[in-house]
Amino acid sequence: RTDNEFLARVCEAAIAAGATVLNIPDTTGYCLPHEYGAKIKYLADNVRGIEKATLSTHCHNDLGLATANSIAGVSNGARQIECTINGVGERAGNTALEEVVMIVRQHPGLGLHTGVNTRLLTETSALVSHLMSMTVQANKAIVGANAFAHSSGIHQDGVIKCRETYEIIDPKEVGAIDSSIVLTARSGRAALAYRLQKLGYHLERPALNSAYAGFLQLADSQREVIDNDLHILIEQHNLITVS
C-alpha cells in the first residue's frame, strides 16, 4: 500500500547500501493482482540501479489472492517468489509453492521456469503436513486429497473417456497416484462399469443395469461406495463374471 514513488526511493537506498534482493511484500494480502503487478512494473521501470538487484514478491493470502498476486509480480519484472509448501503462514497463509510451480509449468507463455521437481510435490506436501500437524484441506489445489477426484457422473464419464476433458494436470506429474473415481449417488453407469472392470468384473448391459440399481440403493444409504461394497453387491446379485 506504500506510495510507488516513495517505495522506489527506498529501493534505491537499499541498492546503494548493497542490497541484492528487493522484497516487495503485500503483508496484509490487500492488493488486487493488477495493482500488485503494476507496482512491481513501476519499480522495475523507475528504480535507478534495479539491474543490480532481484525484485522479489512476498504475498499473503488474506483475500485468497496470494498466488495470483505472485504471478502478477513475476509477469511484470519480479524474478523471485517467496512461497511456502501448502501455503502455510501467518493468518490465512502465504503463496503456495505447489500452485506457483504448476502455474508456471502449465503456462509456458509466461516465459518462466522454476527448476522444481514437480513429482515430489505431493510427497513433500504430506511430509510438511505431518511434521506441522496441519491437515491439508481435501480440495486444496494440486496436493489436496480431492485434487484429482471425480464424483459427478458427467465428470466421471468424461474423465474415463478422455482424462484431459476435466484434468489439466496429469496426477503423476505432481506425484499423485492417479485420478480417483469416487462412487456416490451422483455416479452414473459408466463410472460403476469402470470401477467394476478395475476389480475384474466385466458385465454385459443387462447385468450392469441390475448392478447399477443395487448400487443406487446402496449409495443412497452411505456417503461413498467402496470396493468391498462392490464385491458384496456383485455376489448378492449373482452377477459374477470375472476375467
Where are these regions (language model features)?
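Short secondary-structure capping/turn micro-motifs that flank functional sites
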Residues: 1, 30-31, 89-90, 145, ...
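Short secondary-structure transition/capping segments
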Residues: 4-7, 34-36, 92-96, 149, ...
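Predominant activation on well-ordered alpha-helical scaffold segments within soluble catalytic domains
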Residues: 8-12, 37-44, 68-75, 82, ...
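A mid-to-C-terminal "edge-of-domain" accessory segment
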Residues: 102, 109-243
